[in-house]
């Protein structure tokens, strides 16, 4: 895309223009623009980390993302917004839903970013998404960007699977599901089966059965995410193991009663500087 050359260049560039237009429209409608950095490790032959780098987000990634979102949205709408003789008929569907932000979490987020000099005004509705995008734009490229971006994600509600459609707040979609990755996510496989059933004119599937599967999938997703975070932290500790005594530039990313969290500027590895008072109290 960057060079504008190669096989099928015209077709790819046309798709990219459409993707960028869809992306712009999505944010205008109130989608939240989270740009989280994905940590990767350079490993030696034995799997020991030699360095930390971050996956770069390019227009090609955005192209794939926008058409993936479009496919997920259209499948959810087709299955969930069905009409017979002009009348809406509810059919069982596995949705990926995202509720409005929790006001208590937003208040904590507001207090934290204020320490960096940012003013976050909104507390509910679509105004939160607009204000969040504004703040993330202001923090972009600054030393605290990663910390604020991560905390912004935590301030939002957690997306989950359900047969009860409440829409997807973060994407600003009234209908949304996970359809595009059936080889790695079981909810996508459920959606494929439901779509095939409805395309063939089948009746609505049993809602209770699929709701139980949605609850199970959501629970397992949380466990998988925790395991992923733990594995990344393990590799970061392994990377820093032979660097004890060295000096690094960093910034305070959080505070607690027993010390402060510090994030290194270059690698974004976070650790705790335990307070002397806390150490003395636990001798």
Question: Positions of the model-derived regions?
Answer:
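Electropositive polyanion-binding surfaces
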Residues: 1-279
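A short, hydrophobic C-terminal helix/tail in secreted or cell-surface proteins
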Residues: 281-283
């Amino acid at each position: 895309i960057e060079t504008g050359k190669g096989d099928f260049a015209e077709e790819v560039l046309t798709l990219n223009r459409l993707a960028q237009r869809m992306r712009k429209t999505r944010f205008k409608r109130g989608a939240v623009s989270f740009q989280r950095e994905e940590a990767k490790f350079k490993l030696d032959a034995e799997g020991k980390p030699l360095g930390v780098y971050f996956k770069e987000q390019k227009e090609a990634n955005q192209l794939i993302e926008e058409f993936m979102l479009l496919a997920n949205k259209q499948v959810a709408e087709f299955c969930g917004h069905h009409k017979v003789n002009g009348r809406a008929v509810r059919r069982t569907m596995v949705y990926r839903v995202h509720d409005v932000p929790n006001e208590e979490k937003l208040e904590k987020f507001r207090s934290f970013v204020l320490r960096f000099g940012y003013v976050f005004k909104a507390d509910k509705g679509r105004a939160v998404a607009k204000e969040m995008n504004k703040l993330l734009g202001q923090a972009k490229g600054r030393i605290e960007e990663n910390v604020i971006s991560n905390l912004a994600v935590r301030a939002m509600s957690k997306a989950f699977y359900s047969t009860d459609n409440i829409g997807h707040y973060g994407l600003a979609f009234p209908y949304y599901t996970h359809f595009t990755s059936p080889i790695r996510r079981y909810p996508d496989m459920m959606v494929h089966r439901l779509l095939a059933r409805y395309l063939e004119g089948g009746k609505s599937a049993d809602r209770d059965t699929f709701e139980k599967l949605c609850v199970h999938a959501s629970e397992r997703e949380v466990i998988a995410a925790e395991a992923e975070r733990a594995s990344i932290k393990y590799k970061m500790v392994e990377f820093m193991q032979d660097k004890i005594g060295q000096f690094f530039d960093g910034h305070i990313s959080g505070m607690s009663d027993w010390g402060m969290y510090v994030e290194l500027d270059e690698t974004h590895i976070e650790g705790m500087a335990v307070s002397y008072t806390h150490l003395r109290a636990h001798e």
